[in-house]
């Protein structure tokens, strides 16, 4: 979360009030609006943040959500603002209300890990670009290497092919040798590409968890 395009589309289709009503949690429009209104009146950042999370989770009602990820557009924006407390609020809320683990997607893994560690968020799930040539790895390749070796967290590697800049065999062989990586996320244009990538992962990472494509 969040899926930003749905908010823009809802505003176009239903107007501002209609969009708000569609995305408020099921405890009731008035209760949720009052909670949000009181939060704004009191400048209660925690109340506002939890309301936004609950609104986003409404579409998943009745489904198991073992991990709830905060998208990098939000994570990196909060990092840039220095609003680190938002990560603690998010983590505590998804654990307490949804019995889920918080996940964080970022383009600056080293900086995020330092912040999460300072907040006391232990062994976090972090999805980030991790590849052999440092493609879109903000903070620098060496900082990522140190973090993977020294930090206690569960890494999900994405952009492992660096948008096609690294041959598949070379990319998978390298990422499978890195410490602390628990999963690999990749995109594929067809079944054959998925199968060949899966075979490479099985070859270089025989004890790997399930592959996500």
Label each region the model flagged.
Residues 1-81:
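Active-site beta->alpha loop and helix N-cap motifs at the rims of alpha/beta catalytic domains
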Residues 51, 62, 66, 74-213:
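Beta/alpha (TIM)-barrel catalytic core signal, keyed to glycine-rich beta->alpha loops juxtaposed to Asp/Glu
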């Amino acid at each position: 979360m969040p899926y930003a395009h749905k908010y823009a589309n809802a505003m176009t289709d239903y107007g501002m009030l209609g969009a708000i009503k569609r995305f408020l949690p099921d405890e009731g429009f008035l209760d949720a609006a009052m909670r949000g209104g009181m939060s704004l009146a009191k400048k209660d950042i925690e109340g506002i943040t939890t309301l936004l999370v609950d609104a986003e989770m409404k579409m998943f009602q009745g489904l198991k959500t073992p991990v709830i990820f905060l998208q990098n557009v939000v994570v990196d924006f909060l990092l840039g603002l220095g609003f680190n407390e938002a990560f603690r609020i998010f983590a505590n809320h998804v654990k307490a209300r949804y019995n889920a683990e918080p996940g964080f997607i970022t383009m600056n893994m080293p900086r995020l890990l330092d912040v999460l560690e300072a907040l006391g968020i232990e062994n976090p799930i972090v999805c980030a670009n991790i590849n052999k040539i440092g493609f879109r790895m903000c903070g620098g390749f060496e900082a990522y290497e140190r973090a993977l070796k020294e930090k206690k967290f569960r890494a999900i590697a994405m952009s492992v092919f660096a948008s096609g800049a690294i041959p598949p065999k070379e990319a998978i062989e390298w990422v499978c040798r890195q410490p602390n990586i628990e999963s690999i996320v990749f995109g594929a244009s067809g079944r054959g590409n998925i199968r060949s990538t899966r075979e490479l992962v099985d070859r270089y990472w025989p004890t790997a968890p399930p592959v996500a494509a």
